Amino acid sequence: MEDNTPRQRDPISLTSVANGLENMGAELLESLEEGRAPGSDSSPAEVGGGWSKAGPEHLGRRSLQPALRVRRFCREHTQLFRWICTGLLCTAFAAFLLIACLLDFQRALALFVLFCVVLFFLAHSLLKRLLGPKLLRCVKPLRHPCLNLWFKRGLALAAFLGLVLWLVLDTAQRPEQLVSFGGICVFILLLFAGSKHHRAVSWRAVSWGLGLQFALGLFVIRTEPGFIAFQWLGDQIQIFLSYTEAGSSFVFGEALVKDVFAFQVLPIIVFFSCAMSVLYYVGLMQWVILKISWLMQATMGTTATETLSVAGNIFVSQTEAPLLIRPYLADMTLSEIHVVMTGGYATIAGSLLGAYISFGIDAASLIAASVMAAPCALALSKLVYPEVEESKFKREEGVKLTYGDAQNLLEAASSGAAMSVRVVTNIAANLIAFLAVLAFINAALSWLGDMVDVQGLSFQLICSYVLRPVAFLMGVAWEDCPVVAELLGMKLFLNEFVAYQELSGYKQRRLAGAEEWVGSRKQWISVRAEILTTYALCGFANFSSIGIMLGGLTSMVPQRKGDFSQIVLRALCTGACVSLVNACVAGILYVPRGAEVDCVSFLNTTLSSSSFEVYQCCRQFFQSTSLEFSPEALDNCCRFYNHTICV
């Protein structure tokens, strides 16, 4: 008799999945290797050993013995395999580098230099690990207080005499450099006059910070290897950023990317932010930040947290750098908080660096300005707000940098691109708002000026008069001071993005060989003025950044909102002065290069189209009574420009 009772289905068990047994083959290998039954936590001894003697299981175990041995061998010699793979990769790279150098050393020079730099730091790390304690024991007898004091005094005296000798010999050829030196003195005296605690100023931090800034500027601007290296680095960044066009053209179309500012410049920020996030994930950014902060902390005597924040500001923005030291913000002193704010105002973010380079701003000057601003920000911050409290972070052992939350390289790249969307929309919104406000202010000022017969009254005109002494103290020629003062006003009262965009317009007109004056309006400024302005604009020190800074820090440490509000204006003024002092240092060190030096050779060999160099040399040619130019140079100059000598 058949049973018509409905049969109940056996329930589906998810035990194996819950226990992590999705891969049954891997589980079988593990169970056989450990000597237990598959799917069981018991060993053969516990279950009587019956399963191991069974036919199919026993045969399966014997057939898997080679795989088990290979797996066990690999597990026991993991470190050896890593060393072998590393050795093979290094050997392959060395062979590749050798072949590249033999074929064309000039073409492989950049790769060779990078290889030497990496090799130097690896050797330094190895020697520090092996010989560091021994060297410290050898140097310890030299740390006698009296000997240490005389060493510091001798070093300070040598630095002072070297600076005086430098100024005497170098400024004899270019007296305008003395104006820039006077500007540094004026800005430092003004900051010292507004210092919170005059008697507590650490002159060690101030002098070492300015000294490091000057040394970096000397290497980048004056020495040939430094100048070539930073020019090469700037060129490589420009080439790297040009790949943005592939992605933006696909999304927006080639016509929009070429003709519309938002689709041409803003995608660069997305791409650069993605690259920075990847570098942060692999740990390269943290390594560079730690090395820079170690140098500043060892020389200037600052604390670990404030130094890390300022070093991080070279690469990230004013709200991202404090994230490096977020766990320590609640316990930092007011002086350390002031340093954090000043560092944020004195530098620009790495992602925005790409946008400014896309404007045509000199990449080497932007990179140098960002690096030089770090020690200067520490120095001037300690001048304005000296330390009078006991810091908890005098040593760097207790301070650690995080490596982010990304689990893999793709997630790091994706999160970097996603985070940049907020930056891009913020920039676009600010540009729309600020340019609209500027147009309204100019219209209102023009309306008010017409009532008293003052024609052309505008915000830029007011800034050109009010800030003209500041531009002159930077070392800018007096005829270029009105334009530079306008740009400084835009940076301070609007933002640096608008100012750099305006500066790029002046540079493009200069490179196109346009006339210098159209009526009473200057169409471009000299190369020296452009370089100094690039340094002076490199920073977030503007009134619109106050809210950004307060909002970012308050979200991390809400209980210290009162402390942040108390010192934010002082930090803003200090950050603005850091950029100005940076420009003054560049003014002391700047020397003309290229056609600006030898116009005779330039005009006698190269003159095919109008450019700034052609304009400058032709103007010098028209005004000269002693220089010898070829008749062809005269004909070419007269073809581009009108002069009485051409008749």
Curated annotation (Swiss-Prot):
Pfam families: Gate (PF07670), Nucleos_tra2_C (PF07662), Nucleos_tra2_N (PF01773). The chain crosses the membrane at residues 80-103, 109-127, 147-166, 178-194, 201-221, 261-282, 294-317, 337-359, 366-385, 423-445, 457-478, 534-557, 569-591. It catalyses: uridine(out) + Na(+)(out) = uridine(in) + Na(+)(in); thymidine(out) + Na(+)(out) = thymidine(in) + Na(+)(in); cytidine(out) + Na(+)(out) = cytidine(in) + Na(+)(in); adenosine(out) + Na(+)(out) = adenosine(in) + Na(+)(in). One of its GO terms (molecular function) is pyrimidine- and adenosine-specific:sodium symporter activity. One of its GO terms (biological process) is cytidine transport. N-glycosylated. N-glycosylation is required for localization to the plasma membrane and the transporter activity. Residues 1-79, 128-146, 195-200, 283-293, 360-365, 446-456, 558-568 are cytoplasmic. Its main location: membrane. The keyword Kinase does not apply. Due to its high apparent affinity but slow transport, adenosine could act as a negative regulator of pyrimidine transport under some conditions. It is a multi-pass membrane protein. GO terms for cellular component: apical plasma membrane; plasma membrane. Keywords: Cell membrane, Glycoprotein, Membrane, Symport, Transmembrane, Transmembrane helix, Transport. Residues 34-58 are annotated as: Disordered. Glycans are attached at N604, N642. InterPro entries: C_nuclsd_transpt (IPR008276), C_nuclsd_transpt_met_bac (IPR018270), CNT_C_dom (IPR011657), CNT_N_dom (IPR002668), Gate_dom (IPR011642). Residues 104-108, 167-177, 222-260, 318-336, 386-422, 479-533, 592-647 are extracellular. It is found in: Cell membrane; Apical cell membrane. Sodium and pyrimidine nucleoside symporter of the plasma membrane that imports uridine, thymidine and cytidine into cells by coupling their transport to the transmembrane sodium electrochemical gradient. Also transports adenosine, an atypical substrate transported with high apparent affinity, but low maximum velocity. Therefore, exhibits the transport characteristics of the nucleoside transport system cit or N2 subtype (N2/cit). Involved in renal nucleoside (re)absorption. Belongs to the concentrative nucleoside transporter (CNT) (TC 2.A.41) family. NCBIfam families: nupC. This is Sodium/nucleoside cotransporter 1. The lineage of its organism: Eukaryota, Metazoa, Chordata, Craniata, Vertebrata.
